Amino acid sequence: KKERYILKKIWDIEKPIATIITLYPSTSDLIINDSTTTFITNNVFKCGFGGFYSVNLYSKISTGKREFGKQDTKVNDNYILKCAKISDNIIIACGSLPKTNKLVQNRLNSIIELLAKNKLRKKILFLTDSNKQDNFHPLAPKVRAKWEFM
């Protein structure tokens, strides 16, 4: 398996569902979780959600060097949009990489524009800490135990 578009974990359909947008997929699946998926699951549950769709700016599964510029993103965009439309909130959790990598910054901006074009802007939240200054990735020590949003 070279790409993953969605990882879906739903435990209570009566509660709100979130779409979490991170950078790229891990090797997690429905049963085996990596650290990122574990922190997402724990915090989504603590925030009162009934589950989540994990989607990524890039769909290629890779444990080595990231090749952000060499991926076709059209299919992935459709999956992101599909999940966003059926979710109560869209949580952007890409961390600081968009600040330091122009390709990633442009990709994130294009996803935000896509969501805005589809009238989903009001659903967007950014994962942050109590200072509400920066966007964090779920692995960041400051947000591992408690999520805040801006």
Task: Label each region the model flagged.
Residues 1-34:
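Active-site and ligand/interface coordination hotspots across diverse enzymes
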Residues 17, 50-51, 89, 123:
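Residues at the starts of beta-strands that form the adenosine-phosphate
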Residues 24-27, 60, 97:
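A short, flexible beta-alpha/helix-coil linker loop
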Residues 26-48:
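A short mixed-secondary-structure module that forms the rim of ligand-binding clefts
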Residues 50-66:
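Short connector loops at secondary-structure junctions
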Residues 62, 68-150:
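Glycine/proline-rich loop-helix segments at beta-alpha junctions forming the active-site rim
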